[in-house]
């Protein structure tokens, strides 16, 4: 009752304003902060949601599919408030509960929870357009301001990669059927080789996700073609 606004239709825009969803995201972010992980706040949720939506929009998917990707993107990390381990599955089950309460159609619930449940590289893979867009958006959100550890000497490998990423962009070229991740790395902090060693699994996951969308995943670091 009290957890939901009186809305005729729940949309991505309205979900961003629901206190319950935001409480789970922010608690997950706090937990990960204590454990020494990078930022997983509402800022990350919005970036992933909007990037996932943009990818599908550029590829000509209908508004409904774009909206499903945005909703999955916003809710994909809620399960971090339960535990980092298997957080994709926890997030999917939490989203399932909320979407049922909000009277979402079964097909939409299935698409959203499937995408959320598949987004972690340890346990998942892209299976359709919504999950592919979510994976590409999430795994390419590499940026300096996601690092929360103030002491460079104490950086773990993920801190080092994110801190080294001075700028990054993800571009879809519909004509060439390419999705390109461009990263500007400060190589004094992290070499291109280090980046690949740390994120190889993620990049392979992006390659598979791009293929599901009929695209080739390509990457440039400091202007050099990597893959």
Which positions does each model-derived feature cover?
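Short alpha-helical catalytic segment bearing the HExxH-like zincin motif
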Residues: 69, 73, 90, 116, ...
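Histidine/acidic-rich helix-loop-helix segments that form or flank divalent-metal centers
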Residues: 11, 105-168
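Inter-helical turn/loop segments and adjacent helix faces that build the functional surface
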Residues: 59, 102-106
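Terminal helices and disordered tails flanking the catalytic cores of nucleotide-processing hydrolases
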Residues: 141-227
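Post-HEXXH active-site segment of zinc metalloproteases
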Residues: 86-96, 106
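Non-transmembrane, amphipathic alpha-helical segments
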Residues: 37-40, 125, 198
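Acidic/His-rich, divalent-metal-binding segments that scaffold phosphate/diphosphate chemistry
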Residues: 1-87, 98
């Amino acid at each position: 009752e009290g957890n939901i606004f009186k809305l005729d239709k729940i949309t991505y825009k309205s979900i961003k304003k629901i206190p319950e969803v935001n409480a789970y995201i922010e608690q997950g972010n706090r937990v990960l902060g204590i454990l020494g992980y990078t930022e997983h706040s509402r800022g990350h949720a919005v970036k992933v949601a909007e990037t996932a939506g943009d990818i599908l929009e550029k590829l000509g998917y209908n508004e409904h599919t774009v909206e499903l990707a945005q909703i999955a993107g916003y809710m994909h990390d809620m399960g971090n408030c339960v535990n980092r381990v298997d957080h994709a599955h926890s997030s999917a089950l939490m989203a399932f509960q909320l979407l049922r309460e909000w009277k979402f159609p079964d097909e939409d619930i299935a698409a959203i929870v499937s995408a959320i449940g598949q987004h972690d590289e340890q346990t998942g893979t892209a299976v359709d357009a919504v999950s592919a867009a979510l994976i590409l958006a999430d795994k390419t959100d590499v940026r300096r301001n996601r690092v929360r550890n103030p002491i460079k000497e104490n950086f773990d490998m993920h801190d080092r990669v994110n801190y080294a990423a001075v700028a990054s962009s993800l571009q879809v070229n519909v004509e060439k059927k390419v999705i390109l991740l461009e990263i500007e790395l400060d190589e004094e902090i992290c070499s291109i080789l280090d980046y690949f060693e740390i994120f190889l699994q993620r990049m392979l996951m992006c390659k598979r996700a791009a293929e599901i969308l009929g695209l080739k995943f390509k990457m440039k670091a400091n202007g050099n073609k990597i893959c």
